[in-house]
Amino acid sequence: GNFSIEKNQALLAFIDNLFSQEHSSVVFVSGDKSNGKTHLLQGCIFKALGQDLKAVYVDIKHKLPTDFLNTLSDYDWVCIDNIDQLSEIQQQELFDLYNQIKQTKTKLVVSASKSPGELTVLKDLKTRLSLAVVYRLEQLDDQEKIDLIQRKMQDKNLDIDDKVYAYLFKVFSRDLSEVLSVIDKLDQESLRQKSPISIPFVKKILKI
C-alpha cells in the first residue's frame, strides 16, 4: 500500500495504543484511492493475529453474504475496507454491529475515500460514524512513493533505478497499486528476455 509512516505517525500510535485497551473503539480512516488504507487495515489484522486475537478483514468491494457484518461482534478486531460502497442492507448491518460492540471489547476500524460527513449512508449510521475517531491518511509525494516501492523491491531482490519509477509515474500512472503490478509484469519479462529493467526496456514492453 501507498503508506507513509512518517506522515501518519499519530494514527499509527493511536492504533498501537488500542491493543492495550480493554474497551471497544471505532476508528474511521479516510484517504484517497490507493493511499494505503488497505495496507493499514491489513496491518492491524496481522498484528492482532500475531497476538492470538480473533481478527477479520472485510473488503466491501467483494460480494458478501447477507447478515454477515452484523455477526462479527465476537471478534477482537474487525477491519472493514471501502465502506463508501456499502449497500443499504449492509449499512443497516454495520449500524447493528456498531451498536453490538458497545457491549464488547471489539476494535472496529473502517475505511473510506470520504470523511464520515461526506458519505451517502443512512442518517443513523452517519451519526454513529461521526462519533468515531477520524483520521485522514496523508498522501505521499513521488519521492516517498519511490522509497516505498524500493523497500518492496528489496524484499524481491529487485534493483531498479529511481529514474525508471519516475518515468513510470510520468507516462504510466501515479497510482501505486497500478505501478506495482506493472513492475511485476516488467520483472517477468526481464527474466524471460534476460534484460535489465531500464527506461528503454519499459518503453519496449509497455509500447509507450
For the regions a language model picked out, list residue spans one by one.
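Conserved AAA+ ATPase "sensor/coupling" helix adjacent to the nucleotide-binding pocket
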Residues: 132, 146-159
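Dynamic helix-loop-helix/coil hinge segments at AAA+ ATPase domain boundaries and subdomain interfaces
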Residues: 1-12
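Conserved AAA+ ATPase "SRH/arginine-finger" region at the nucleotide-binding site
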Residues: 132-144
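The conserved phosphate-sensing helix
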Residues: 172-186
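Conserved P-loop NTPase "ATPase switch" module shared by AAA+ and STAND
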Residues: 71-93, 97, 104-112
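Short conserved motifs of the RecA-like P-loop NTPase core
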Residues: 159-172
